[in-house]
Amino acid sequence: NKLGCPNCIRPDGTHSLTKPNTEDGLTEYGFCVVDRMQELGMSVDVSHLSDRGFYDVYENTTKPFLASHSNARAVTSHVRNLTDDMIRKLSVRGGIIGVNFETTFLGKENDCGIAAVIRHLEHLHKIGGEDCLALGSDFDGIKGNSELTGVQDMVRLRDALQHAGWKQRILDKLFFENVLRFYR
């Protein structure tokens, strides 16, 4: 990768879904691209970056950035998910985190439906606050989730969140307001 090291594939070609890559981050070219993106007002997305890449973006930018389709590592230990420290840093900067519906990032194979999405959302809310919450389903890139198969199922997710006690104001932020704010 010319820009930076992804979170699952190391520069030597090896893969690790369990050990975060804390050493390999943005390349020299990647730093230049991120700088130019900031100058142009473009959004930087850290969802596929290594842990080191995330911190390279955080430490070398001043504007909000996002994780368009990522979850909480404290809920499901997967290198694609964000640590609590990452969630805090991204949210303090004014960024958003779109919860991913990919079963691998949500939890165990038999527990990766709406309840798992809610667990990740609750953790993100607890650590990063209501202004970082967003949906990043990844419907166009995942093999499927038995309970959330497409946009038609968002009503089911909203109903489940309401049943779990989520207030309409926070649901509005999650479903559209935070993303609108971020991109304005």
What are the residue ranges of the model-derived segments?
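Short acidic/histidine-rich active-site segments
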Residues: N100-F101, G128-V151
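Short, internal active-site loops enriched in acidic
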Residues: S50, F139-G141, L180
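Mid-to-C-terminal alpha-helical segments outside catalytic/metal-binding sites
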Residues: T149-R184
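Short, solvent-exposed loop/turn segments at secondary-structure boundaries
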Residues: S77-V79, E109-C112, N145-L148
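Glycine-rich anion/phosphate-binding loops
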Residues: I114-A116
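Extended, charged catalytic domains and RNA/DNA-binding interfaces, predominantly
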Residues: N1-T104, I118-H125, C132, D153-R156, ...
